[in-house]
Amino acid sequence: MKVLMVRAKIKDENVADAQAAVEKVIQALDQAQPADVRYASCLLSDGVTFVALLKLEDDGGHPLRELPAYAEMVENLKQWYAEPPDVEQMTVTGSYGLLHDR
């Protein structure tokens, strides 16, 4: 299993656009229902920083890349970033329902 955390500061004028794009991705995931994928996006209290968590299996696949809504969001984010995003791979040391099924 691979878990990625993306922390991205968005320009003030694009926060609503970024939130709408996240909602489109969630809707696309609801429709596609890819197996073994967990995705969450949160807005920090500063109102401009998003933190996304993505859990994928280690087989090298990335089902989100197959979703047009995700591709559109990634392309738009290039213009919406206030600064380069920080992407880190994480090791899960414990999870209750967020990254594993119970």
Task: Show the residue positions of the predicted features.
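Short, well-ordered beta-strand segments in beta-rich or mixed alpha/beta enzyme
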Residues: 2-9, 37-68, 101
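Generic beta-strand hydrophobic packing signal
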Residues: 6, 87-90
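Short, surface-exposed ligand-recognition loops at beta-strand->loop->(often short) alpha-helix junctions
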Residues: 9-20
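Short alpha-helical
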Residues: 13, 47, 72
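Residue-level signal for secondary-structure boundary sites
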Residues: 14-16, 60-61, 95
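An amphipathic, aromatic/His-enriched active-site/gating alpha helix that lines ligand/cofactor pockets
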Residues: 24, 28-38, 54-88
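Hydrophobic/anchoring residues in structured secondary elements
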Residues: 41, 89-92
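Short, low-order "capping/linker" segments at domain edges
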Residues: 91-102
